[in-house]
Swiss-Prot record:
Regulation: Inhibited by SERPINA5.
Residue positions with a glycan: N127, N215, N308, N396, N453, N494
UniProt GO BP: blood coagulation; fibrinolysis; inflammatory response; liver regeneration; plasminogen activation; positive regulation of fibrinolysis
Designated gene of the protein: Klkb1
The protein's name: Plasma kallikrein
Keyword Protein biosynthesis included in the entry's annotation: no
């Protein structure tokens, strides 16, 4: 019998690997060795998700079936680590193995919406209610502060007294304590991690107050904000108290106490100097933090197990080295004279059991911070995080200001700008499907990047050709969703100061509130205008879909769409901007939030523009890119 350890898998989200994004699963394969912990999960995808958010897990093996003498191992999720990023593989029927998605920022999401028919996910049953449907049961779980997963007995369940019963459950790990096949039972998880809870979102931070409730765990953090992020992703933390470096008890300095209570609310706070308290944000619909921390702390040293030390120029370079180094969770960059050479100063790469520093010291000559691996949102680490800062009511852009913008042009008798697009990888452009209505022929298209003025394009101007045009299989018209297309280029782009990719959002960003958004393009600057020579830009506010729907009563504004525009009109995307980017700056990064799709006229009052919501299509984008790579490998010479 195996020992299933009850571990706080979300204590830290700062573990890293450096072998690139490996999302494929290996059937009938089991990784040997490297054991970290074992839990129960209903399928391999959920096992992979748990591995991703475990501080040290790099690989996993899941047993979909088990030998008759080891039935307790069925649904076992075995989390593993490896210094090299790989482990020996053995054949085992029914086993499914794979990699953590820590290095796949675009796929990072704690949300798990799948429903499992015929399974009883067991745990501590703390509430039982009668409901009419599985959906209602899942909603009850999502809106109960303690519920982590649930089981619903259908009307065909063999015991009449339990039919249509909804059992709300929890465990110390946030995962089932066992899973058993049972007919007419259906199980699933709370959707709090999908930002669908209606509980509310207390964001208060209480300076000089402490909560005296039950501690579920503790970690070392540099400030209360990292403490809050750790609490948010811990399965049982509801609120926290953090003691600063000035706290009187030395052993508790920089300690983040993760707390809970039976009622789900903290007891009245106690006045304590140098204590900071607050709430988990896991019930928030709009303000969930990212599972990473960008800040570099000057004059601070993070202690932990040392992986490696190298010499680099500056703390930013040290953070980048940590991000790219296998297993590095945090780092310290030393400026001590004995730690500096001609090529740079010492960068110590470190890790710990829970992914947080084991100790933090101050007045150090240097600085410290965390790996940014889980902050990455695109396949390429080259996506643009910093820039120098159809558009009706817009202004001229400057060269290199929007380096992901491309012009899609058609060469027939003459050559004309038709649509915009966005660079998302060295060989990939994202644009709108409707750009190819009537012109679905790759050979007639030319793609220009790194340009500002269309008039600068001559016969000698380099351009990219289309190798593969991938229009969403469900696309019919722009007003009906799925207005998205991928272009694979014949040859990879060279990234320059003026030609770089934009970061893609993650699936978890579907409910993010963006406040700094821009549209760009060479399209008309008025409804009956003409294509502009200079790339135009305009800042534009997002409009809630509910409000947008009221403006377009003859259309359906779906969750795959996002609206933007001013109530009074005057600024909008227009003809020629189609397929171009709606970008927003969030947490220090520019993200491709929307693709210019359709609207009623241009910049009309009470008529916002409608954009394809990129976060809703991340899986589709990644699937098509991966499929293209696999086809290329199959056709390449041996």
């Amino acid at each position: 019998m195996i020992l299933f350890k009850q571990v706080g898998y979300f204590v830290s989200l700062f573990a890293t690997v450096s072998c690139g994004c490996l999302s494929q699963l290996y059937a009938n394969t089991f990784f040997r060795g490297g054991d970290l912990a074992a839990i129960y999960t209903p399928d391999a995808q959920h096992c992979q998700k748990m591995c991703t958010f475990h501080p040290r897990c790099l690989l996993f093996s899941f047993l979909a079936v088990s030998p008759t003498k080891e039935t307790d191992k069925r649904f076992g999720c075995f989390m593993k680590e490896s210094i090299t990023g790989t482990l020996p593989r053995i054949h085992r029927t029914g086993a499914i193995s794979g990699h953590s998605l820590k290095q796949c920022g675009h796929q990072l999401s704690a949300c798990h919406q799948d429903i499992y028919e015929g399974l009883d996910m067991r745990g501590s049953n703390f509430n039982i209610s009668k409901t009419d449907s599985i959906e209602e049961c899942q909603k009850l779980c999502t809106n109960n502060i303690h519920c982590q997963f649930f089981t619903y007995a259908t009307k065909a369940f063999h015991r009449p007294e339990y039919r249509k019963s909804c059992l709300l459950k929890r465990s110390s790990s946030g995962t089932p304590t066992s899973i058993k096949p049972v007919d007419n039972l259906v199980s699933g998880f709370s959707l709090k991690s999908c930002a669908l809870s209606e509980i509310g979102c207390p964001m208060d931070i209480f300076q000089h107050f402490a909560f005296a409730d039950l501690n579920v765990s503790q970690v070392v953090t540099p400030d209360a904000f990292v403490c809050r992020t750790v609490c948010t992703f811990h399965p049982n933390c509801l609120f926290f108290t953090f003691y600063t470096n000035e706290w009187e008890t030395e052993s508790q300095r920089n300690v983040c106490f993760l707390k809970t209570s039976k009622s789900g609310r903290p007891s009245p706070p106690i006045i304590q100097e140098n204590a900071v308290s607050g709430y988990s944000l896991f019930t928030c619909r709009k303000a969930r933090p990212e599972p990473c921390h960008f800040k570099i702390y000057s004059g601070v040293a993070f202690e932990g197990e040392e992986l490696n030390a190298t010499f680099v120029q500056g703390a930013d370079a040290c953070q980048e080295t940590c991000t790219k180094t296998i297993r590095c969770q945090f780092f310290t960059y030393s400026l001590l004279p004995q730690d500096c050479k001609a090529e740079g100063c010492k960068c110590s790469l470190r890790l710990s059991t829970d992914g947080s520093p084991t100790r933090i010291t101050y007045e150090a000559q240097g600085s410290s911070g965390y790996s940014l691996r889980l902050c990455k949102v695109v396949e390429s680490s080259d996506c643009t995080t910093k820039i120098n800062a159809r558009i009706v009511g817009g202004t001229n852009s400057s060269l290199g200001e929007w380096p992901w913008q491309v012009s899609l042009q058609v060469k027939l008798v003459s050559q004309n700008h038709m649509c915009g697009g966005s660079i998302i990888g060295r060989q990939w452009i994202l644009t709108a499907a409707h750009c190819f209505d009537g012109i679905p022929y790759p050979d007639v298209w030319r793609i220009y990047g790194g340009i500002l003025n269309l008039s600068e394009i001559t016969n000698k101007t380099p351009f990219s050709s289309i190798k593969e045009l991938i229009i969403h299989q469900k696309y019919k018209m722009s007003e009906g969703s799925y207005d998205i297309a991928l272009i694979k280029l014949q040859t990879p782009l060279n990234y320059t100061e003026f030609q770089k990719p934009i970061c893609l959002p993650s699936k978890a960003d579907t409910n993010t509130i963006y406040t700094n958004c821009w549209v760009t393009g060479w399209g008309y600057t008025k409804e009956r205008g003409e294509t502009q020579n200079i790339l135009q830009k305009a800042t534009i506010p997002l409009v809630p879909n509910e409000e947008c729907q009221k403006k377009y009563r003859d259309y359906v504004i779906t969750k795959q769409m996002i609206c933007a525009g001013y109530k009074e009109g005057g600024i909008d995307a227009c003809k020629g901007d189609s397929g171009g980017p709606l970008v927003c700056k969030h947490s220090g990064r520019w993200q491709l939030v929307g693709i210019t799709s359709w609207g009623e006229g241009c910049a009309r009052k009470e008529q916002p523009g409608v954009y394809t919501k990129v976060a809703e299509y991340i899986d589709w984008i990644l699937e098509k890119i991966q499929s293209s790579k696999e086809r290329a490998l199959e056709t390449s010479p041996a």
